[in-house]
A protein has these predicted regions:
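Terminal alpha-helical segments
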Residues: 1-122
Length: 122
């Protein structure tokens, strides 16, 4: 099972991938949204492992943990919304825009990051 440190490394990798794109010119905005979501997912998995030794797993199981764990409940809505945007991009083929990413996706990710990182060891 991946450790807290491994999940954090993958979260940083996904975040770096998302941030490398010029949002005004890239044709890959769907991948940007997806990368922000997976960065958030690995932050959630890092905290689940750190607090309760819960391994990462299926999206449905993780969603239930985000709803039920007291240390994750505060980001329940942000996590769900970010996941929904990612699914819009991946499965429903909804066109993403730089404005949507700047005004919705990045703030959602940042709220999750700001909630989780202080709870993890330095």
């Amino acid at each position: 099972m991946p450790t807290t440190r491994e999940h954090l490394a993958r979260a940083r990798q996904n975040l770096a991938f998302a941030q490398q794109f010029n949002l005004k010119t890239t044709p890959y905005l769907d991948w940007v949204v997806t990368a922000y979501f997976y960065a958030a997912l690995h932050l959630v998995d890092a905290l689940l492992w750190e607090k309760d030794k819960v391994p990462g797993g299926l999206h449905e199981i993780r969603r239930d943990y985000v709803k039920s764990k007291s240390y994750l409940r505060a980001i329940r809505d942000q996590y769900k919304e970010l996941k929904d945007h990612s699914e819009d991009a991946r499965y429903r083929l909804i066109t993403m825009t730089s404005t949507r990413i700047e005004q919705k996706i990045i703030p959602l990710y940042k709220a999750i990051e700001d909630h989780i990182l202080p709870q993890l060891p330095k």
